[in-house]
């Protein structure tokens, strides 16, 4: 069984120790958040399971790893994006007469069904991509990010319910931090930008530890 509380605590401590007093590292990571492949590349290094935050050197390698990690996410998201375009652009949804109440009701039902399908697909992609990214980092093999059988097997060892609940806990924490920042007038966006490195370190370490819980001892 996954100890989400312990993973949460360890991830906070990891992010705190990785940035506390290291203002040069913090500033470099803030800049890398703007050049997002760099930050993804840094998260890629955290995914490898290091016990301390990795050094922010070899920017070319980080950029390359970040691009590859982005491509993994894009490849998994592409079917959902294509399905969204196909379903919402279908003639039945576009060409509905506003004078026909039955047609309008049918349109509403169709939109609801399509939305449910897309939400389910997006959630499934998120669940798979999360483990796929860590697997890619651990094996250093791009093709392993698409080894669906092993990815599903790994999540099954963690336990699907534990896996989903743990990721939801991480998402809730990140949402709370974001909302607190955004409700602060004027300075909120600046504060959120300043906290992005902490949030990135926290979430990538959290996912890495969650992945470890499904690794055979």
PLM feature spans:
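Interfacial aromatic "cap" segments that immediately flank transmembrane helices
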Residues: 5-31, 56-82, 128-178, 211, ...
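Alpha-helical membrane-embedding segments
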Residues: 80-97, 169-187
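Short, small/hydrophobic-residue-rich motifs at membrane-helix boundaries and re-entrant hairpins
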Residues: 28-51, 60-61, 65-126
